[in-house]
Amino acid sequence: MELWASLDRVLTTVAEPGTLRSVTERFQQHQVRLALWTFVQEQFSAVQQIVNAGVQVAPIVPNLPAFVRDVTGGGPVKAMIGRFRALPSGTKFALPLRNAGNALKLAKQDFGMGLSILAEMELARCVPLGIRDAVISSAVIDLAVALNNRDVLVRLLALVERRFGLSVVVETANLGVSASKLIEWGIDTQRLTYLSPINRAGYGMRPSQAACELVCRSGRVRVVAADIDCDGELRLDDADPYVRALGVQGYLLPDSIR
């Protein structure tokens, strides 16, 4: 049973080197295989220190909430330029060339193309971290499924797998719906790993606990369970046997476990 962990809550409070040490020691103690991190440029140096301590990190991309905040503060062009300036020099040259054929789509504010470029810039910044996996954000996955927009997801999968050579984790708040939709779209889901709430209480399991359990037991997809303790409402002794019985690949280390 693999243990994963989230860096997002931790890094909002990181201020001292001692805090970073305690984070890495906790992950090492529990043999965390993968630490998930929603890409934030200002946190990059802290994440680099965690990686240097031997913790494997997987970015969650694209960070739409951060992009929306930047757009609100200065418009989409300024938000994109700021991200472009932070790229490695080689990527600054290659990115415009790769997307030259998509200029018309960008001019028309094609949503899917914009998401792809945003994710590409974030992943390019994460390459120095030695990443081997990338998580496609639930904000994108669930929206694509809701709008029945296969092209958005296919484009992002190609970006992560072919352009960067990474394994894909699909984050979703609607496991039962998303898993069936991707199969309907003809996507080879056996190469993907799903990250979604799975717990004995059925908290966050959509469209229903039974539907999510069926996905886990199907053997057609790999699932890593999030929220197994329902934000601290369940003891790990009660939560762990339930997810193990479903045959999940692993689960996110609850914040309550020190």
Language-model-derived ranges and their functions:
Residues 1-54, 239-242:
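N-terminal binding-site loop/beta-alpha segment at the start of enzyme catalytic domains
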Residues 2-4, 33-36, 44, 54-60, ...:
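Structural preference for beta-strand elements that scaffold enzyme active sites
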Residues 4-15, 68-74, 142-148, 203-206:
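Short, flexible/disordered intra-domain loops and linkers
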Residues 4-19, 98-118, 146, 229-234:
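Active-site mouth loops of central-metabolism enzymes
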Residues 17-30, 83-86, 103-136, 142, ...:
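Alpha/beta enzyme core
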Residues 21, 41-47, 52, 60-70, ...:
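N-terminal active-site wall of soluble small-molecule enzyme domains
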Residues 57-119:
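Substrate-binding cleft of extracellular glycoside hydrolase catalytic domains
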Residues 141-258:
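Beta/alpha (TIM)-barrel catalytic core signal, keyed to glycine-rich beta->alpha loops juxtaposed to Asp/Glu
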